[in-house]
Protein backbone atom coordinates (compact mmCIF):
# COMPACT_ATOMS: atom_id res chain seq x y z
CA UNK A 1 0.00 0.00 0.00
CA UNK A 2 2.87 2.42 0.76
CA UNK A 3 4.36 1.81 -2.69
CA UNK A 4 0.99 2.37 -4.36
CA UNK A 5 0.47 5.55 -2.35
CA UNK A 6 3.92 6.81 -3.34
CA UNK A 7 3.19 6.27 -7.05
CA UNK A 8 -0.13 8.12 -6.85
CA UNK A 9 1.43 11.04 -4.95
CA UNK A 10 4.31 11.34 -7.44
CA UNK A 11 1.86 11.27 -10.35
CA UNK A 12 -0.29 13.98 -8.84
CA UNK A 13 2.64 16.15 -7.80
CA UNK A 14 4.07 16.01 -11.34
CA UNK A 15 0.67 16.87 -12.76
CA UNK A 16 0.21 19.91 -10.53
CA UNK A 17 3.72 21.23 -11.08
CA UNK A 18 3.58 20.93 -14.85
CA UNK A 19 0.96 23.60 -15.47
CA UNK A 20 -0.20 21.76 -18.57
CA UNK A 21 -2.96 23.24 -20.68
CA UNK A 22 -6.40 21.73 -20.17
CA UNK A 23 -7.85 21.02 -23.59
CA UNK A 24 -11.40 22.03 -24.36
CA UNK A 25 -12.43 18.38 -24.70
CA UNK A 26 -11.68 17.84 -21.00
CA UNK A 27 -13.88 20.65 -19.75
CA UNK A 28 -17.15 19.86 -18.02
CA UNK A 29 -19.68 21.98 -16.12
CA UNK A 30 -17.89 23.42 -13.11
CA UNK A 31 -14.53 21.75 -13.68
CA UNK A 32 -12.52 19.30 -15.74
CA UNK A 33 -12.73 15.60 -16.56
CA UNK A 34 -10.08 13.68 -14.63
CA UNK A 35 -9.55 10.06 -13.67
CA UNK A 36 -11.64 9.24 -10.63
CA UNK A 37 -8.67 8.18 -8.54
CA UNK A 38 -7.28 11.73 -8.97
CA UNK A 39 -10.47 13.27 -7.63
CA UNK A 40 -11.42 11.72 -4.28
CA UNK A 41 -14.50 13.18 -2.59
CA UNK A 42 -15.32 15.23 -5.69
CA UNK A 43 -12.42 17.68 -5.56
CA UNK A 44 -8.97 17.53 -7.12
CA UNK A 45 -6.10 17.02 -4.68
CA UNK A 46 -4.37 20.32 -5.43
CA UNK A 47 -2.13 20.52 -2.35
CA UNK A 48 -0.42 17.16 -2.07
CA UNK A 49 2.38 18.51 0.10
CA UNK A 50 -0.08 19.43 2.85
CA UNK A 51 -2.53 16.57 2.38
CA UNK A 52 -3.09 14.49 5.48
CA UNK A 53 -1.68 10.97 5.24
CA UNK A 54 -5.03 9.60 6.32
CA UNK A 55 -6.61 11.16 3.23
CA UNK A 56 -4.41 9.13 0.89
CA UNK A 57 -3.77 5.78 2.55
CA UNK A 58 -6.35 3.30 1.36
CA UNK A 59 -7.72 5.75 -1.20
CA UNK A 60 -10.34 4.03 -3.40
CA UNK A 61 -12.50 5.61 -6.08
CA UNK A 62 -16.05 4.36 -6.35
CA UNK A 63 -17.15 3.19 -9.82
CA UNK A 64 -20.48 2.46 -11.46
CA UNK A 65 -20.14 1.22 -15.05
CA UNK A 66 -23.48 2.84 -15.92
CA UNK A 67 -22.45 6.26 -14.57
CA UNK A 68 -20.95 8.36 -17.36
CA UNK A 69 -21.40 11.75 -15.66
CA UNK A 70 -20.59 14.70 -17.95
CA UNK A 71 -17.35 13.10 -19.16
CA UNK A 72 -18.82 10.23 -21.21
CA UNK A 73 -16.56 7.65 -19.52
CA UNK A 74 -17.27 5.94 -16.23
CA UNK A 75 -13.55 6.01 -15.35
CA UNK A 76 -13.62 9.82 -15.48
CA UNK A 77 -15.39 12.31 -13.26
CA UNK A 78 -16.18 16.00 -13.55
CA UNK A 79 -13.91 17.36 -10.84
CA UNK A 80 -14.77 20.66 -9.22
CA UNK A 81 -11.16 21.76 -8.88
CA UNK A 82 -8.27 21.24 -11.30
CA UNK A 83 -4.86 22.72 -12.09
CA UNK A 84 -5.04 26.16 -13.63
CA UNK A 85 -4.58 26.09 -17.43
CA UNK A 86 -1.79 27.98 -19.14
CA UNK A 87 -1.92 29.77 -22.46
CA UNK A 88 1.33 28.41 -23.88
CA UNK A 89 1.38 24.63 -23.58
CA UNK A 90 -0.38 22.45 -26.14
CA UNK A 91 0.45 19.09 -24.56
CA UNK A 92 -2.40 16.81 -23.64
CA UNK A 93 -2.93 16.92 -19.87
CA UNK A 94 -2.05 14.04 -17.64
CA UNK A 95 -5.41 14.29 -15.92
CA UNK A 96 -7.18 11.84 -18.20
CA UNK A 97 -4.83 9.90 -20.46
CA UNK A 98 -1.45 9.40 -18.81
CA UNK A 99 -1.04 6.23 -16.78
CA UNK A 100 0.67 6.09 -13.43
CA UNK A 101 3.44 3.58 -13.06
CA UNK A 102 2.14 0.49 -11.25
CA UNK A 103 3.91 -0.42 -8.04
CA UNK A 104 6.28 -3.36 -8.53
CA UNK A 105 5.12 -6.70 -7.24
CA UNK A 106 6.92 -7.05 -3.93
CA UNK A 107 5.38 -10.48 -3.34
CA UNK A 108 6.88 -12.90 -5.86
CA UNK A 109 4.73 -15.81 -4.74
CA UNK A 110 2.28 -17.14 -7.31
CA UNK A 111 -1.49 -17.21 -6.86
CA UNK A 112 -1.78 -13.95 -4.94
CA UNK A 113 -4.99 -12.12 -5.83
CA UNK A 114 -5.61 -8.46 -5.08
CA UNK A 115 -8.67 -9.12 -2.97
CA UNK A 116 -11.17 -6.34 -3.59
CA UNK A 117 -9.07 -5.00 -6.47
CA UNK A 118 -6.79 -1.96 -6.72
CA UNK A 119 -7.65 1.76 -6.68
CA UNK A 120 -11.28 1.38 -7.77
CA UNK A 121 -14.34 0.06 -5.99
CA UNK A 122 -16.78 -1.16 -8.66
CA UNK A 123 -20.27 -0.80 -7.18
CA UNK A 124 -23.66 -2.30 -8.05
CA UNK A 125 -21.74 -5.31 -9.25
CA UNK A 126 -22.40 -9.03 -8.87
CA UNK A 127 -20.65 -10.69 -11.80
CA UNK A 128 -17.74 -8.37 -12.68
CA UNK A 129 -14.24 -8.41 -11.26
CA UNK A 130 -12.64 -5.44 -9.56
CA UNK A 131 -9.71 -3.75 -11.27
CA UNK A 132 -6.56 -5.96 -11.07
CA UNK A 133 -8.33 -8.38 -8.73
CA UNK A 134 -7.10 -11.47 -10.60
CA UNK A 135 -3.71 -10.50 -12.06
CA UNK A 136 -3.08 -13.80 -13.89
CA UNK A 137 -5.93 -13.51 -16.42
CA UNK A 138 -4.68 -12.94 -19.99
CA UNK A 139 -6.47 -11.47 -23.01
CA UNK A 140 -5.28 -13.21 -26.20
CA UNK A 141 -5.75 -11.63 -29.62
CA UNK A 142 -4.69 -12.22 -33.22
CA UNK A 143 -3.16 -9.28 -35.04
CA UNK A 144 -4.80 -8.00 -38.19
CA UNK A 145 -2.21 -8.03 -40.95
CA UNK A 146 -3.73 -5.01 -42.70
CA UNK A 147 -4.06 -2.82 -39.61
CA UNK A 148 -1.19 -1.82 -37.36
CA UNK A 149 -1.75 -2.24 -33.62
CA UNK A 150 -5.14 -3.83 -34.21
CA UNK A 151 -6.31 -7.33 -33.40
CA UNK A 152 -9.28 -9.62 -32.92
CA UNK A 153 -10.03 -11.26 -29.59
CA UNK A 154 -9.28 -14.99 -29.71
CA UNK A 155 -9.69 -16.39 -26.20
CA UNK A 156 -8.66 -16.11 -22.59
CA UNK A 157 -5.50 -17.47 -21.03
CA UNK A 158 -3.67 -17.76 -17.73
CA UNK A 159 -0.19 -16.58 -16.79
CA UNK A 160 1.75 -19.40 -15.09
CA UNK A 161 5.29 -18.12 -15.64
CA UNK A 162 6.93 -14.94 -16.90
CA UNK A 163 7.33 -16.61 -20.30
CA UNK A 164 4.34 -18.98 -20.42
CA UNK A 165 0.57 -18.68 -20.80
CA UNK A 166 -1.72 -21.72 -20.72
CA UNK A 167 -4.97 -21.89 -22.67
CA UNK A 168 -7.14 -24.35 -24.59
CA UNK A 169 -5.73 -26.00 -27.71
CA UNK A 170 -8.89 -25.71 -29.80
CA UNK A 171 -8.95 -21.92 -29.47
CA UNK A 172 -5.55 -21.71 -31.14
CA UNK A 173 -6.46 -23.90 -34.13
CA UNK A 174 -5.72 -22.03 -37.35
CA UNK A 175 -4.60 -18.89 -35.49
CA UNK A 176 -1.41 -17.00 -36.29
CA UNK A 177 0.21 -13.77 -35.12
CA UNK A 178 -1.06 -14.20 -31.58
CA UNK A 179 -0.44 -11.56 -28.94
CA UNK A 180 -0.92 -11.97 -25.18
CA UNK A 181 -2.19 -8.88 -23.38
CA UNK A 182 -1.49 -8.63 -19.66
CA UNK A 183 -3.16 -6.24 -17.24
CA UNK A 184 -6.38 -5.95 -19.28
CA UNK A 185 -9.63 -5.26 -17.44
CA UNK A 186 -12.11 -3.18 -19.45
CA UNK A 187 -11.66 -3.69 -23.19
CA UNK A 188 -13.81 -0.63 -24.01
CA UNK A 189 -11.43 1.95 -22.55
CA UNK A 190 -7.74 2.84 -22.43
CA UNK A 191 -8.08 4.92 -19.28
CA UNK A 192 -7.28 2.21 -16.75
CA UNK A 193 -4.72 3.34 -14.15
CA UNK A 194 -1.83 0.98 -14.97
CA UNK A 195 -0.39 0.21 -18.42
CA UNK A 196 -1.00 -3.09 -20.17
CA UNK A 197 1.76 -5.22 -21.65
CA UNK A 198 1.31 -6.72 -25.13
CA UNK A 199 3.78 -9.51 -25.93
CA UNK A 200 3.98 -11.58 -29.11
CA UNK A 201 3.48 -15.33 -28.87
CA UNK A 202 6.62 -16.96 -30.28
CA UNK A 203 5.34 -20.54 -30.22
CA UNK A 204 2.15 -22.51 -29.59
CA UNK A 205 2.70 -25.95 -28.05
CA UNK A 206 -0.39 -28.14 -28.12
CA UNK A 207 -0.69 -31.34 -26.14
CA UNK A 208 0.57 -34.19 -28.37
CA UNK A 209 -2.65 -36.16 -27.83
CA UNK A 210 -4.95 -33.23 -28.52
CA UNK A 211 -7.96 -34.19 -30.65
CA UNK A 212 -10.69 -31.77 -31.68
CA UNK A 213 -13.51 -34.25 -32.33
CA UNK A 214 -14.31 -35.80 -29.96
CA UNK A 215 -12.38 -33.20 -28.00
CA UNK A 216 -9.56 -34.58 -25.86
CA UNK A 217 -6.46 -33.15 -24.13
CA UNK A 218 -7.61 -29.62 -24.93
CA UNK A 219 -4.61 -27.74 -23.56
CA UNK A 220 -1.87 -25.61 -25.08
CA UNK A 221 1.10 -23.54 -23.94
CA UNK A 222 1.87 -20.14 -25.43
CA UNK A 223 5.57 -19.35 -25.29
CA UNK A 224 6.11 -15.59 -25.16
CA UNK A 225 8.72 -13.80 -27.26
CA UNK A 226 9.95 -12.06 -24.10
CA UNK A 227 9.29 -12.11 -20.39
CA UNK A 228 6.30 -10.26 -19.05
CA UNK A 229 7.23 -7.79 -16.33
CA UNK A 230 5.48 -8.53 -13.06
CA UNK A 231 3.69 -5.68 -11.30
CA UNK A 232 0.86 -5.28 -8.83
CA UNK A 233 -1.69 -5.93 -11.60
CA UNK A 234 0.26 -8.66 -13.46
CA UNK A 235 1.22 -11.83 -11.60
CA UNK A 236 1.08 -15.60 -12.25
CA UNK A 237 -1.19 -18.19 -10.70
CA UNK A 238 0.06 -21.39 -9.07
CA UNK A 239 -0.34 -24.80 -10.68
CA UNK A 240 -2.07 -27.56 -8.70
CA UNK A 241 -0.51 -30.77 -7.52
CA UNK A 242 -1.42 -33.86 -9.60
CA UNK A 243 -3.32 -35.25 -6.61
CA UNK A 244 -5.36 -32.10 -5.92
CA UNK A 245 -9.13 -32.45 -6.15
CA UNK A 246 -11.62 -29.59 -6.04
CA UNK A 247 -15.03 -31.28 -5.93
CA UNK A 248 -17.41 -29.40 -3.65
CA UNK A 249 -15.33 -26.23 -3.69
CA UNK A 250 -16.61 -22.96 -5.13
CA UNK A 251 -14.03 -21.51 -7.48
CA UNK A 252 -13.68 -18.33 -9.54
CA UNK A 253 -13.72 -18.12 -13.33
CA UNK A 254 -12.93 -14.96 -15.30
CA UNK A 255 -13.20 -13.88 -18.92
CA UNK A 256 -14.76 -11.51 -21.44
CA UNK A 257 -17.29 -13.90 -22.96
CA UNK A 258 -21.04 -13.56 -23.23
CA UNK A 259 -23.28 -12.95 -20.25
CA UNK A 260 -27.02 -13.05 -20.88
CA UNK A 261 -26.30 -12.96 -24.60
CA UNK A 262 -23.96 -9.94 -24.58
CA UNK A 263 -20.16 -9.94 -24.62
CA UNK A 264 -18.63 -8.40 -21.51
CA UNK A 265 -16.41 -5.33 -21.66
CA UNK A 266 -15.26 -5.60 -18.06
CA UNK A 267 -13.65 -8.86 -16.98
CA UNK A 268 -16.26 -11.15 -15.44
CA UNK A 269 -16.03 -12.89 -12.08
CA UNK A 270 -18.24 -15.93 -11.59
CA UNK A 271 -18.14 -18.19 -8.56
CA UNK A 272 -19.01 -21.76 -9.54
CA UNK A 273 -19.25 -25.09 -7.70
CA UNK A 274 -16.94 -27.87 -8.89
CA UNK A 275 -18.94 -31.03 -9.59
CA UNK A 276 -17.78 -34.63 -9.29
CA UNK A 277 -17.14 -36.67 -12.43
CA UNK A 278 -19.98 -39.17 -11.97
CA UNK A 279 -22.49 -36.46 -11.16
CA UNK A 280 -21.35 -34.35 -14.11
CA UNK A 281 -21.62 -37.31 -16.49
CA UNK A 282 -25.19 -37.86 -15.34
CA UNK A 283 -26.07 -34.18 -15.82
CA UNK A 284 -24.55 -34.05 -19.31
CA UNK A 285 -26.41 -37.19 -20.33
CA UNK A 286 -29.71 -35.60 -19.34
CA UNK A 287 -28.68 -32.34 -21.03
CA UNK A 288 -28.63 -34.05 -24.40
CA UNK A 289 -25.47 -36.12 -24.79
CA UNK A 290 -27.35 -39.38 -24.37
CA UNK A 291 -27.24 -42.38 -22.02
CA UNK A 292 -23.83 -43.65 -23.13
CA UNK A 293 -21.83 -40.46 -22.69
CA UNK A 294 -18.97 -40.50 -20.17
CA UNK A 295 -16.87 -37.46 -19.27
CA UNK A 296 -13.24 -38.07 -20.19
CA UNK A 297 -10.47 -38.10 -17.60
CA UNK A 298 -8.89 -34.86 -18.76
CA UNK A 299 -11.91 -32.75 -17.85
CA UNK A 300 -13.77 -31.49 -14.80
CA UNK A 301 -17.12 -29.73 -14.46
CA UNK A 302 -18.24 -26.57 -12.71
CA UNK A 303 -21.49 -24.63 -12.61
CA UNK A 304 -24.94 -25.99 -13.29
CA UNK A 305 -26.66 -23.00 -11.70
CA UNK A 306 -29.23 -20.96 -13.61
CA UNK A 307 -27.79 -17.94 -15.49
CA UNK A 308 -24.36 -18.31 -13.84
CA UNK A 309 -21.96 -19.84 -16.32
CA UNK A 310 -18.98 -19.21 -18.54
CA UNK A 311 -20.15 -18.88 -22.13
CA UNK A 312 -19.21 -18.18 -25.75
CA UNK A 313 -15.97 -16.21 -25.81
CA UNK A 314 -14.74 -17.52 -22.46
CA UNK A 315 -12.75 -20.43 -23.91
CA UNK A 316 -9.22 -20.69 -22.52
CA UNK A 317 -10.07 -18.67 -19.40
CA UNK A 318 -9.11 -19.86 -15.92
CA UNK A 319 -11.04 -21.58 -13.15
CA UNK A 320 -9.10 -20.65 -10.02
CA UNK A 321 -9.60 -22.36 -6.67
CA UNK A 322 -8.39 -20.95 -3.38
CA UNK A 323 -6.39 -23.11 -0.98
CA UNK A 324 -6.62 -22.99 2.80
CA UNK A 325 -3.62 -20.64 2.85
CA UNK A 326 -5.43 -18.18 0.57
CA UNK A 327 -3.31 -18.94 -2.49
CA UNK A 328 -5.10 -19.55 -5.79
CA UNK A 329 -4.28 -22.51 -8.02
CA UNK A 330 -5.35 -23.12 -11.61
CA UNK A 331 -7.89 -25.93 -11.29
CA UNK A 332 -9.45 -25.69 -14.74
CA UNK A 333 -9.49 -24.04 -18.15
CA UNK A 334 -12.80 -23.22 -19.86
CA UNK A 335 -13.18 -25.74 -22.70
CA UNK A 336 -16.77 -26.44 -23.80
CA UNK A 337 -20.39 -26.65 -22.71
CA UNK A 338 -24.00 -27.17 -23.74
CA UNK A 339 -25.58 -23.74 -23.98
CA UNK A 340 -24.92 -21.23 -21.22
CA UNK A 341 -26.30 -21.07 -17.70
CA UNK A 342 -28.83 -23.88 -17.93
CA UNK A 343 -30.07 -25.53 -14.75
CA UNK A 344 -28.10 -28.73 -14.03
CA UNK A 345 -25.98 -28.16 -17.14
CA UNK A 346 -22.43 -27.49 -15.93
CA UNK A 347 -19.60 -26.19 -18.06
CA UNK A 348 -16.67 -28.44 -18.91
CA UNK A 349 -13.10 -27.42 -18.08
CA UNK A 350 -9.68 -28.90 -18.74
CA UNK A 351 -8.59 -30.56 -15.47
CA UNK A 352 -5.18 -28.94 -15.06
CA UNK A 353 -4.01 -31.37 -12.37
CA UNK A 354 -4.03 -34.09 -15.06
CA UNK A 355 -1.50 -32.14 -17.11
CA UNK A 356 0.93 -30.81 -14.51
CA UNK A 357 3.64 -33.27 -15.52
CA UNK A 358 3.33 -32.22 -19.18
CA UNK A 359 3.50 -28.55 -18.22
CA UNK A 360 6.51 -29.22 -16.00
CA UNK A 361 8.36 -30.99 -18.81
CA UNK A 362 7.95 -28.03 -21.13
CA UNK A 363 9.02 -25.54 -18.49
CA UNK A 364 12.20 -27.56 -18.06
CA UNK A 365 12.64 -27.92 -21.83
CA UNK A 366 12.41 -24.17 -22.24
CA UNK A 367 15.01 -23.77 -19.47
CA UNK A 368 12.74 -21.27 -17.80
CA UNK A 369 13.52 -20.60 -14.17
CA UNK A 370 11.54 -18.42 -11.77
CA UNK A 371 12.51 -16.96 -8.42
CA UNK A 372 9.36 -18.30 -6.81
CA UNK A 373 7.69 -21.68 -6.43
CA UNK A 374 5.04 -22.27 -9.10
CA UNK A 375 3.82 -25.45 -7.41
CA UNK A 376 4.85 -28.02 -9.99
From Swiss-Prot:
Domain Clip intervals: 24-80
InterPro entries from the UniProt entry: Peptidase_S1_PA, Peptidase_S1_PA_chymotrypsin, Peptidase_S1A, Trypsin_dom
Location of the protein in the cell: Secreted
Glycosylation sites per record: 41, 125, 279, 369
Region forming the signal peptide: 1-19
A Gene Ontology molecular function term of the record: serine-type endopeptidase activity
Post-translation changes: Secreted as a full-length protein. Proteolytically cleaved into two chains which probably remain covalently linked. Cleavage is induced by fungus B.bassiana and Gram-positive or Gram-negative bacteria infection.
Effect of deleting the gene: RNAi-mediated knockdown causes a loss in phenoloxidase (PO) activity, a reduction in microbe melanization and CLIPA14 proteolytic cleavage in response to S.aureus infection. Also, causes a reduction in microbe melanization and CLIPC9 proteolytic cleavage in response to E.coli infection. RNAi-mediated knockdown in the susceptible strain G3 infected with P.berghei, does not affect the number of oocysts and ookinete melanization; however, severely reduces ookinete melanization caused by CTL4 RNAi-mediated knockdown.
Site entry: Cleavage: 60-61
Region (Disordered): 85-106
Bridged cysteine pairs (disulfide): 28-78, 33-71, 39-79, 251-321, 280-301, 311-340
GO CC, alphabetical: extracellular space
Homology family: Belongs to the peptidase S1 family. CLIP subfamily.
Subunit structure: May form a heterodimer of a light chain and a heavy chain; disulfide-linked.
Protein task: Inactive serine protease which plays an essential role in the innate immune response against bacteria, fungi and protozoa infection by activating the melanization cascade. In the melanization cascade, acts downstream of TEP1, SPCLIP1 and CLIPA8 to promote CLIPC9 proteolytic cleavage. In the susceptible strain G3, appears to be dispensable for parasite P.berghei ookinete elimination which occurs by lysis. Required for the melanization of Gram-positive and Gram-negative bacteria. Required for the melanization of fungus B.bassiana.
UniProt cross-references to PANTHER family, sorted A to Z: LP15124P-RELATED (PTHR24258:SF129), SERINE PROTEASE-RELATED (PTHR24258)
Name of protein: Inactive CLIP domain-containing serine protease A28
Species name: Anopheles gambiae (African malaria mosquito)
